[in-house]
């Protein structure tokens, strides 16, 4: 204890307190102390406050609120409510939203952009309240009208359309996490995000937004467009009511589209840049449905606004209703002119007998349906005129197709990128009219895969890069047109948003659709295939567009819709994908072969 005593004295001289520690080898952790004003008997007091504190349970830490984008940028504390008090004081309450947080890898495809909320912004309701009433109120308020609901009202058909967000429908928001150096890439990514976000909201609320209409009789979910279902073959399918898309009280799909454009787009007030020859007016007045004449008389720009093609009910099963000069009856009635019994071969051409017309004659019994024999298999001989320059293959008004016929013109005259945004927007609008909510969600999920790939490929692209990509597209298409003319296989070329860019003569004979009928307006590949094929289209697109696949891919189901109503051509379709320099899908070449 002598060593301990001397230690006490030394410590006591320094701080006025004598601290005692037991000799080495002791296992006790108890600290004792002698105070200078202790009792004379040298009572030792034990300090157990430190040991008690170490064994007490720590208080639960309060959850930290997620800061808004403004407070997060300034590294300031934020509140849970929105808008927060700091943003209200600064007058920026309309931008007070939760800051985007880093997501796990498996959540990359889910949208991270929050919906704006704030006291100064228009009230769009919670996700379960966004419905036809809010969209109708906003649109009618812009035109100084009272809210109303009519048969042709666009809000009755698209309850949660893009119009629920009138501030910036497709422009990238200021608080968006991904910044693009190109406006074209910005716009395209924004519309993809809008499609996924709105359809995810619709998926949660599709039972809420349905309501009873007093003025119309709704058959329930929107029926399929000219699909090969049981309704197609029923006797009622030939009635005047079924004209392509399902209509309510003889309202055609283009009538609804026409009502939308007449109210909200000022393009009807301006004459479009393209001419309107009599032949084209005659064709589109028939192929655009019951309201085709009104659409053409309004002088709407068919390149900027989408009106779907509606198959026509042909009584005689021919395409004479859209031919300037009807076919010669002596040729069409003579079976020897389109069928050779010796070699089991049919003859089709673009002049008086296309493949849909031949199929109608076979199905109706006017021509004997033959099968493979021991010597000859059933075949079809296609007669096409040689490329003599009389046909129109390029047009400066076709921004979506081949504009120029020489490489020099392409590199010199193309000085702006092609915007895929209107195509995606009108594609979603068209699919909403044609398919049920369940199908839409499945299609949009396939389209959602494109967003993270699109970010990775195009986030560093500039406006000059996008212009160069369009030049590459035009130059590649010009070269492919020369190849396609020599191949002789029915071929269609379309962009990544599904917009048709080119069709060859063989496809005209196979489907019955003329090149000018598909390219003189905004047309999508999904317009000319049936419902089951459209579902397969998006699955196939998701398989090849986002993966490193070289070569070709085959659609499991492909049925072409023809201009003749209820006439469907079953085909095998092979896809060939062409990518641009950044890895994005540049164009898709589809080769179609009929199944006899």
Swiss-Prot record:
Q: Does the keyword Chloroplast apply?
A: no
**Could you name the domain of life of the organism this protein comes from?**
Eukaryota
Q: Which UniProt keywords apply?
A: Activator, DNA-binding, Gluconeogenesis, Metal-binding, Nucleus, Transcription, Transcription regulation, Zinc
Q: Which GO terms describe its biological process?
A: carbon catabolite activation of transcription; carbon catabolite repression of transcription; cellular response to starvation; gluconeogenesis; positive regulation of gluconeogenesis; positive regulation of transcription by RNA polymerase II
Q: Which residues form the PAS domain?
A: 476-548
Residue ranges: DNA binding = 68-96
The segment annotated Disordered runs over 1-59, 209-260
Q: What main location does UniProt list?
A: nucleus
Q: Name one Pfam family in it.
A: PAS_13
Family annotation (InterPro entries)? ERT1_acuK_gluconeogen_tf (IPR050335), PAS (IPR000014), PAS-like_dom_sf (IPR035965), PAS_13 (IPR056751), Zn2-C6_fun-type_DNA-bd_sf (IPR036864), Zn2Cys6_DnaBD (IPR001138)
Q: Where in the cell is it found?
A: Nucleus
A cellular component term, taken from the record's GO annotations: nucleus
The annotated regions of Polar residues compositional bias extend over: 1-42, 244-260
Instruction: Name the protein family.
Output: Belongs to the ERT1/acuK family.
Q: What does this protein do?
A: Transcription factor which regulates nonfermentable carbon utilization. Activator of gluconeogenetic genes.
**What protein am I looking at?**
Transcription activator of gluconeogenesis ERT1
Task: Give the gene symbol.
Answer: ERT1
